[in-house]
Amino acid sequence: RLLSMIIKSLILDMDGVIWKDNSPIGDLPAIFQEIRRKGFKFILATNNAVRTLPAFQEKLAELGVEIHLNEIVNSAMAAADLLKERFPSGGPVYIVGEDGLINALAVEGFYPADDHVLAVVAGLDRKFTYEKLNRANYHIRCGAPFIGTNPDRTFPIPNGYVPGAGSILAAIEAASETSPTIAGKPSPGLYHLALKRLGTAPGETLAVGDRIETDIVGGQKMGLRTALVLSGVTTPEMAEAYSPAPDMIANDLAEVISRL
């Protein structure tokens, strides 16, 4: 099956695909030049809800890649999109999170509040406290919908793993006895948002990621074509063992693009 015949656009994960531990994976300026030369539209889609979009743009610029803000989506934006569908006019929400989440919600008309909130929205918050846990628990038990940015329980740093958004969601879930609606991968929210931006059908869009349980599972659920790269957390053995197999397994993003 010649993927190159049908693919019109790309949804690219960032961590483990474009960089690892802040170091670029491959010659990024050349890779993105090739993506644009081949005429692919693309969106960078990440579960990271902590950084703001300008911070992502700045980081990519440091690595020699110029990206427009409308070429990036993250799970904070997917959470705001989910809320907007339910509460079109915006309003007060209880937020457990950092600037990336607060800013994404503000764009859609939602602002942080402590009382009479429409929903509880939670993600990674490196200043998480018992008091925040208690407030989130209170609002959810009073009937506020509980939305989580992404389920990643940990994320890698050079010397190991640290707690991610999923660990905070797990604490709130344990206290409130309520599971969150997840906005990020592998739930469809983030891909849905990316497809809206791209304007292409799932079958002609290739999702490229390094994590089977989020990037590949999520992409397959949405009917996207999928490419698993071995430049992040997945080993060749894990890739071979996973079924249903992705459309492509490649060493890195450069190889994916060369095969399209």
Where are these regions (language model features)?
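Asp-based, Mg2+/Mn2+-dependent phosphohydrolase catalytic module
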Residues: 2-14, 19-38, 49-73, 80-260
